[in-house]
Amino acid sequence: MRGALAGLSLATLATASPVLVNSIHNDAAPIISASNAKEIADNYMIKFKDHVTQNLAAEHHGWVQDLHEKTQVAKTELRKRSQSPMVDDIFNGLKHTYNIAGGLMGYAGHFDEDVIEQIRRHPDVELVERDQEVHVLGSESEVEKNAPWGLARISHRDSLSFGTFNKYLYTEDGGEGVDVYVVDTGTNVDHVDFEGRASWGKTIPQGDADEDGNGHGTHCSGTVAGKKYGVAKKAHVKAVKVLRSNGSGSMSDVVKGVEYAAESHLEQVSITKKGKRKGFKGSTANMSLGGGKSPILDKAVNAAVDAGIHFAVAAGNDNADSCNYSPAAAENAVTVGASTLADERAYFSNYGKCNDIFAPGLNIQSTWIGSKYAVNTISGTSMASPHVAGLLAYLLSLQPAKDSAFAVADISPKKLKANLISIATVGALTDVPSNTANILAWNGGGESNYSAIVEKGGYKATHRPTMLEEIESEAKVASKKVYSEGDELAHKVAELTEKVEDLIAGELKDMFRELKRE
């Protein structure tokens, strides 16, 4: 009966979401696939059951690698005996092991079908998920603008106007003492806009270089913490490369990157308690990437948040329900949709109940690769999410340092997320579906006291002319003026023409009279 009920609940899940679950047989763990993603053949992520300890996990890892190697040897020997042609079916075995602050334990690897079937039947295994491709969430480059309007927008309550378009209201030390893990394609750490505050954390894809060969991660990092382009201008960026230079990678590598960020954060907490780091105030993270629904990635992000990292993730660029994508569906993170200069939901932005907040994401200028001065303007929820990751760092920095005599209890990610939402601007955007929170991120408008910002609470947007509406209004006034002046001029021209015609007619009459006399 227990197995039948489990099968029923999983079947229901498969029909209600883009996650497909293979049929369960002999009490084997299910294999989960994302129907809206491209799978990586014969690559899997495995999640342990909650009872598994570190020692049990280590024993299991040894067992699975031994099983893999014996299976490979046996198949090779069988092929030799049968004189079958050699085929390229070499499997690499164990790739990653996971332990994200005890909240997610498991591993990933490249296994053949026989091995994965035995893994499924192991009593320590809860589920098996097919690995899938993950990609950045940006769109094509746009013409560069002279100023980052997104910064101005998150520091003003009402729609931007000519008077506020280039004005970013902020606290000078915003972000100081906070580490921001940008889990992406890497970061151009030598860019001048980082002022030496960016460093390389870890490269996850095997054999890849410690550099951003794509630009996407650098752009996100600049929006988080750049001197000119960043929300939190004193934060420290930690580059975590999980995607290759083409902007894509594997879900299993992304999970490993999340684990690195969590472990690194906990290490900083530990050395701060030992007095080896001064002024540390906490960590945030940004993931402007996505793929199909992945319960393991969502679990990884939730575990990292439980470990103390304040996570911002992009909602996605498919103009669809963000709950069908990961990590957008991770409930502990802050899921961010994209808005436009005209205070609209960006046409590409995902929506739905998994969205927590909106931030600027169309035509965003920030740092780039190619030189230490390079900039680029691109669009996507990838550009919206780092506004919020930077804002989380900004708000964290307004607290006393953990080693300060004035230190207070840490603001948990859950509490800061709730505060971020509570102070946001309500009803600012148009074209937001009814099942989606219509709130726009706000940084406090330059206020440096965190409690004072929170006490201000939310703000109901009032419709004031946007900058585009101002342009349209002034154009209409100018048009009317031109029309009025043109009408007056035309009348004068008509009068003059009539006088000229009368004069010419008179002259012609006189000329004909003279001709008749001759």
From Swiss-Prot:
GO terms for biological process: proteolysis. Its EC number is 3.4.21.-. Glycans are attached at N246, N286, N449. It comes from the Eukaryota. The record marks N317 as: Important for catalytic activity. Residues 1-16 form the signal peptide. Residues 44-136 form the Inhibitor I9 domain. Residues 148-454 form the Peptidase S8 domain. The active site is at D184, H216, S382. GO terms for molecular function: IgE binding; serine-type endopeptidase activity. PROSITE patterns: SUBTILASE (PS51892), SUBTILASE_HIS (PS00137), SUBTILASE_SER (PS00138). Keywords: Allergen, Glycoprotein, Hydrolase, IgE-binding protein, Protease, Serine protease, Signal, Zymogen. It is an enzyme of class 3 (hydrolase). CDD domains: Peptidases_S8_PCSK9_ProteinaseK_like. Residues 17-138, 460-518 form a propeptide. Residues 244-298 are annotated as: IgE-binding. Serine protease. Belongs to the peptidase S8 family. This is Subtilisin-like serine protease Cla h 9.0101. It comes from Davidiella tassiana (Mycosphaerella tassiana).
